[in-house]
Amino acid sequence: MAFIPRTLTEDNLELVTQVNHFANFLLTNLLVDLLAAAGKSRVVMVSSLAHGWVQNGLNYEDVTWEKSQYSMTAAYGNSKLANILFAKEFGRRHQERGIRSYSVHPGTVLTELGRDIRNKLPVFLVPVTDYLSSLFLMTPKGGAQTILHCAVEPGLSQETGLYYANCQVKTPSKAAQSSEEARKLWQFSSDIVGDISPLKIR
């Protein structure tokens, strides 16, 4: 989810952050025992190059944008940075249980992600932007390749917590490389999710 006006959920969380990060955090932790029991499991977090839009790390004091001017791009970038940090810390915590995790930039893919922006364009610009998008953006099939690579490539079985793009390990932004930041996000997310679900996070 991306590029929508600031919206609060019934849990009083900002919608983009809840859908893109907190929901993933909750679901993955609900499944963790099943993943461990299955053996040699993998979790792939779909992040984005947009994580690099966040220069100074996550702002834990204002995740709902109550105190600052809401930015659609920053909210999306924050959630994608959180995906990388979550994959990093999840991998560290669960590698001994046989679970591997990866974060992925799938590429700039022609999807409905920017539909809210498209719907606000002048009518005469819509066919122009649609045409240009078809020329320069990846197809969904192309965008799925790095995700599938991380999910099934045998050569990755000993790796965990890494960031991939174009089916190769890439170096994410400085903020996304911090193990301390990954642990901080984990604890923060555990506290938030713990208020919503009785889940015991490990």
PLM segments and residue spans:
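Rossmann-fold NAD(P)H-dependent dehydrogenase/reductase core
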Residues: M1-P122, V193-R202
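Alpha/beta-hydrolase superfamily serine-hydrolase fold, recognizing
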Residues: A2-I4, S173, E180
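A short, mixed-charge helix-start or loop-turn motif at secondary-structure junctions
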Residues: E10, S68, M72, T129-S133, ...
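C-terminal helical subdomain
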Residues: S79, S103, P127-K170, S179-R183
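Generic recognition of well-ordered alpha-helical segments
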Residues: E89, T146-H149, F188
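Short glycine/threonine-rich loop-to-helix capping motif typified by GTGT followed
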Residues: R115, A175-A176
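Intracellular terminal tails of multi-pass secondary transporters
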Residues: Q177-R202
